[in-house]
């Protein structure tokens, strides 16, 4: 299907907007992937906030010109799917996880922070925990000393409470003896 000039410009503008917001771009060759598998990949990407696009490479090159992803322009050849994500690791995770189960999806390259990533770089980026997981781990680390302090205080309180009960029990017979002697 051929696009006229205004349609091409609309695609370029849309992808330029994606590239301006995104932190990461991952490119993968999708030759031989079934429609069902591609639909599954797009669904997984949507859940993670990743925008996947199949674009003409010429339009993709024009769209990323002047952005941090321009470093990938010379690698934009062949049937590629482009994954843009605002989260630094989301696009790499989605594509790498899908490529593990489907050998027809082949990671070609990626870009993060203006640097080109090779296949291994994309896989390493995919292994980094997401922002939400890292924040949860940080909260756990910050809460750990507080939790330990609370546990120690509870244990001391329980020991002290047991000591008070023992003293009270010991004082009761003494009080009974004193009352009997007074009577």
Swiss-Prot record:
<dbReference type="GO" id="GO:0003735">
    <property type="term" value="F:structural constituent of ribosome"/>
</dbReference>
<dbReference type="GO" id="GO:0070180">
    <property type="term" value="F:large ribosomal subunit rRNA binding"/>
</dbReference>
<dbReference type="InterPro" id="IPR022973">
    <property type="entry name" value="Ribosomal_uL10_bac"/>
</dbReference>
<comment type="function">
    <text>Forms part of the ribosomal stalk, playing a central role in the interaction of the ribosome with GTP-bound translation factors.</text>
</comment>
<dbReference type="InterPro" id="IPR043141">
    <property type="entry name" value="Ribosomal_uL10-like_sf"/>
</dbReference>
<keyword id="KW-0689">Ribosomal protein</keyword>
<dbReference type="InterPro" id="IPR001790">
    <property type="entry name" value="Ribosomal_uL10"/>
</dbReference>
<keyword id="KW-0687">Ribonucleoprotein</keyword>
<keyword id="KW-0699">rRNA-binding</keyword>
<dbReference type="Pfam" id="PF00466">
    <property type="entry name" value="Ribosomal_L10"/>
</dbReference>
<dbReference type="GO" id="GO:0006412">
    <property type="term" value="P:translation"/>
</dbReference>
<comment type="subunit">
    <text>Part of the ribosomal stalk of the 50S ribosomal subunit. The N-terminus interacts with L11 and the large rRNA to form the base of the stalk. The C-terminus forms an elongated spine to which L12 dimers bind in a sequential fashion forming a multimeric L10(L12)X complex.</text>
</comment>
<dbReference type="GO" id="GO:0015934">
    <property type="term" value="C:large ribosomal subunit"/>
</dbReference>
<dbReference type="InterPro" id="IPR047865">
    <property type="entry name" value="Ribosomal_uL10_bac_type"/>
</dbReference>
<keyword id="KW-0694">RNA-binding</keyword>
<protein>
    <recommendedName>
        <fullName>Large ribosomal subunit protein uL10</fullName>
    </recommendedName>
</protein>
<comment type="similarity">
    <text>Belongs to the universal ribosomal protein uL10 family.</text>
</comment>
<dbReference type="InterPro" id="IPR002363">
    <property type="entry name" value="Ribosomal_uL10_CS_bac"/>
</dbReference>
